[in-house]
From Swiss-Prot:
This is Ubiquitin-like modifier-activating enzyme 5. Keywords: ATP-binding, Metal-binding, Nucleotide-binding, Ubl conjugation pathway, Zinc. The keyword DNA-binding does not apply. The active site is at C244. Belongs to the ubiquitin-activating E1 family. UBA5 subfamily. CDD domains: ThiF_MoeB_HesA_family. GO terms for cellular component: cytosol. It comes from Culex quinquefasciatus (Southern house mosquito). Zn(2+) binds at C220, C223, C297, C302.
Length: 397
C-alpha cells in the first residue's frame, strides 16, 4: 500500500507542476486594450479587416458594435463558436449562460480544449475569450435558467444587461439543446419584449436552423410548438441511457456562422435579417421562410405583444419605400474599366497596337472575320438543271 508520506509527495509534485503550468500561461503575451477602433492597415491592428467593411460601404459605422450587448444562452457546440465569433468581431459586451462542465466528449466540437475538461463551460469560455479580445466585457452566469429561482435571475440579467448596465441587452441568442430551456427564453423575451434568435442542430447532426423572433411581430417559439409538445410527450422520456445525439463540428460551425451573420446584420443594420433560415447538409439546401405569430398562442405575453403591435400605426416597410439612388462606392475609374453589352460587337481599334508609340508589337495577326450573307442565292447556285440530268450526272460519277 502507498504510505501517507508518498501520497503527500505526489500531491506536492502535482501542485508544483500546476504552479509551473500557471506560470507559463501567465507569461503568454496579451495585447493591451484598445480604446478606439482604427481602420489603419497594419499587422498590429486587430480591427483593420473589420473596419474595411465600413470603407467598402457595407456598414455605415462598424464601431457601433462596441455599444452592443448580447446574451448567449448555452455555451455548447453552437454557443461557444457563436461567442468566439462575436468576441473576434469586437462586440461590446457578452453575457454567457450555462450550468454544464467541459467534458472530453465535447472535444469533437470546436472551441474547447482537453486541458479545460472539468471546468464550467462559462468560466472556461470567459478565460479563452478574454485572451482572444480583452476589449470585450464578458460576464458569466453558471446556473440552470429553467428552475424557478434561476429564471428570475436570468430575467434580471437580460433586463439590466445593457452596455452601461442600465437597460436591457440588445439581443438574446438561444444556443441551448432542449425544449424546456427554449421555452424559458421564449417566456422571458415575450414578457420583456426583447428580440432574440433561436438556433438548433438536429440529433442526427446533418441539419440545423436559426429563427429570428420579434415578440408580437413574428411567431414566437410557443406559436408553432414542435412534435414533443404537440403530442404531449415528456422530453425526458426520449433520452435513453447509453444513447447520445450525433454531433458534427461542421454543422454546428455552419449554424453558428448563420446565427452570428444575422446578429451582425441586426446590430449594425445592414443587409436583410432572415426570419427563418434552415440548413440541410445532405443536399446543401438553405430554405428560408417567414413565420407569422399565432393569435391563439398559449403564451399570454405573446398575445399581448401582438395586440400592442396591431395598435401601432402602420409604417412603410423597407420594400415599400423607394430607395434613393446611391452614389457609387468607388467614383474613380483608375483603370478605365467599362461595361460592354454581350450582344455588342467590339469595333476594331483605330490605331493598330504595333504602330502605336508604346513599345509594343503584336505577337500574331488577328484573322479577319468573314462576313456571312444570309441570302440563300449566295450559297446555292441555280443552273436550271432538271432532276433527271442531276441523276444521270450522279450515276456517271
Amino acid at each position: 500500500m502507498t504510505s501517507v508520506a508518498e501520497l503527500r509527495e505526489q500531491v506536492r509534485s502535482l501542485q508544483d507542476e500546476l504552479a509551473q503550468l500557471k506560470g507559463e500561461r501567465g507569461k503568454t503575451t496579451t495585447r493591451e486594450k484598445i480604446t478606439k477602433m482604427s481602420s489603419e492597415v497594419v499587422d498590429s491592428n486587430p480591427y483593420s479587416r473589420l473596419m474595411a467593411l465600413q470603407r467598402m460601404g457595407i456598414v455605415k459605422e462598424y464601431e457601433q458594435i462596441r455599444q452592443k450587448s448580447v446574451a448567449v444562452v448555452g455555451v455548447g457546440g453552437v454557443g461557444s463558436v457563436t461567442a468566439d465569433m462575436l468576441t473576434r468581431c469586437g462586440v461590446g459586451k457578452l453575457i454567457l449562460f450555462d450550468y454544464d462542465k467541459v467534458e472530453l466528449a465535447n472535444m469533437n466540437r470546436l472551441f474547447f480544449t482537453p486541458d479545460q475538461a472539468g471546468l464550467s463551460k462559462v468560466e472556461a469560455a470567459a478565460k479563452t475569450l478574454n485572451y482572444i479580445n480583452p476589449d470585450v466585457k464578458i460576464f458569466t452566469n453558471n446556473y440552470n435558467i429553467t428552475t424557478v429561482e434561476s429564471f428570475e435571475k436570468f430575467m434580471n440579467a437580460i433586463r439590466t444587461g445593457g452596455i452601461d448596465g442600465s437597460g436591457a441587452v440588445d439581443l438574446v441568442l438561444s444556443c441551448v439543446d432542449n425544449f424546456e430551456a427554449r421555452m424559458a427564453i421564449n417566456a422571458a423575451c415575450n414578457e420583456l419584449s426583447l428580440n432574440w434568435f433561436e438556433s438548433g442542430v438536429s440529433e442526427n447532426a446533418v441539419s440545423g436552423h436559426i429563427q429570428f423572433i420579434q415578440p408580437g411581430e413574428k411567431a414566437c417559439f410557443a406559436c408553432a410548438p414542435p412534435l414533443v409538445v404537440a403530442e404531449n410527450i415528456d422530453e425526458k422520456t426520449l433520452k435513453r441511457e447509453g444513447v447520445c445525439a450525433a454531433s458534427l463540428p461542421t454543422t454546428m460551425g455552419i449554424v453558428a456562422g448563420m446565427l452570428v451573420q444575422n446578429t451582425l446584420k441586426y446590430l449594425l443594420k445592414f443587409g436583410t435579417v432572415s426570419d427563418y433560415l434552415g440548413y440541410n447538409a445532405l443536399i446543401d439546401f438553405f430554405p428560408k421562410m417567414g413565420l407569422k405569430p399565432n393569435p391563439t398562442c398559449d403564451d399570454r405575453f405573446c398575445v399581448l405583444r401582438q395586440q400592442e403591435f396591431a395598435a401601432k400605426p402602420k409604417e412603410e416597410t423597407f420594400e415599400e419605400v423607394q430607395q434613393e439612388e446611391e452614389s457609387p462606392v468607388h467614383a474613380e475609374n483608375l483603370y478605365g474599366i467599362e461595361l460592354v453589352s454581350e450582344t455588342e460587337v467590339e469595333s476594331a481599334p483605330t490605331v493598330p497596337v504595333a504602330t502605336a508609340n508604346t513599345g509594343l508589337k503584336l505577337a500574331f495577326e488577328t484573322p479577319i472575320q468573314m462576313e456571312h450573307s444570309s441570302a440563300a442565292t449566295d450559297v446555292i447556285k441555280n443552273d436550271d438543271v432538271s432532276l433527271d440530268d442531276l441523276m444521270a450526272q450522279m450515276k456517271a460519277i
